[in-house]
């Protein structure tokens, strides 16, 4: 059985790993997933990630980030735009997620970026997911 939404699979694996208090999580790699992980790392939601090759298949391993008292850095991570229903937004329509404590991750003509960076560049796009 083939997977229809690879990004949703990645987000679910990260969410489940945080709920299980795992240190690392791995999944098959792709360019869009790497771009999303770049944004998560830049915004401070994950420690780091590496891409490795096993049997001609690329895998990404993500080092999850926890606070000193063991709380997860990501409370919620949800897919917004799905293959069956794409969600696009102009930058003026994107209000701060959780009173600017969370972020939206957007796919724009200038690449994948957070809503904060999109506000600076004044560009909208497809809303991939929301993170808090």
Swiss-Prot record:
One of its GO terms (cellular component) is ribonucleoprotein complex. Signal peptide: none annotated. The keyword Zinc does not apply. Transmembrane segments: none annotated. InterPro entries: Ribosomal_uS8 (IPR000630), Ribosomal_uS8_CS (IPR047863), Ribosomal_uS8_sf (IPR035987). One of its GO terms (molecular function) is rRNA binding. SUPFAM superfamilies: Ribosomal protein S8. GO terms for biological process: translation. Keywords: Ribonucleoprotein, Ribosomal protein, RNA-binding, rRNA-binding. HAMAP family: Ribosomal_uS8_B. NCBIfam families: PRK00136.1. Belongs to the universal ribosomal protein uS8 family. One of the primary rRNA binding proteins, it binds directly to 16S rRNA central domain where it helps coordinate assembly of the platform of the 30S subunit. Part of the 30S ribosomal subunit. Contacts proteins S5 and S12. This is Small ribosomal subunit protein uS8. It comes from Rickettsia rickettsii (strain Iowa). The lineage of its organism: Bacteria, Pseudomonadati, Pseudomonadota, Alphaproteobacteria, Rickettsiales. The gene is rpsH.
